[in-house]
Amino acid sequence: GGARLSDGELANGHFYGATLLSNISADMLIYREETFGPVAAVVPFDDDDDVIAMANDTRYGLAAYVYTQNLARALRTFEQLQFGIIGINDINPTSAAAPFGGMKESGLGREGAREGIEEYLETKLGGISI
């Protein structure tokens, strides 16, 4: 269930309070879709391979976040995740100087940085013999 906020700052519906969801199953939309809002779904897992498989089990792949103190685990997880942006112990791994974009159905190409402008350029090759 849920309830409509009726008082306080959030009563007018312009904001959504941070929400943590548990008891999530793979058939729920929150498990499969990209939710743009302050919502986090908590899903238990057995090991790294299990959680990586669950994370990649989606048509989308904009951003993923990993929290660990183990550098080897962080690098291994980074390599296996199918997301365009991955924050390791970082909630904001992007910058204006970095290429921004997702994988799968989260978009093609990149915005920003050199990779972003290259899609708008025409390359020419010329050869001259005199």
What are the residue ranges of the model-derived segments?
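Single, function-defining residue in the core of a domain
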Residues: 12
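Conserved C-terminal structural/oligomerization subdomain of aldehyde/semialdehyde dehydrogenase
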Residues: 15-130
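Short, solvent-exposed loop/turn elements at beta->coil junctions and helix N-caps
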Residues: 1-9
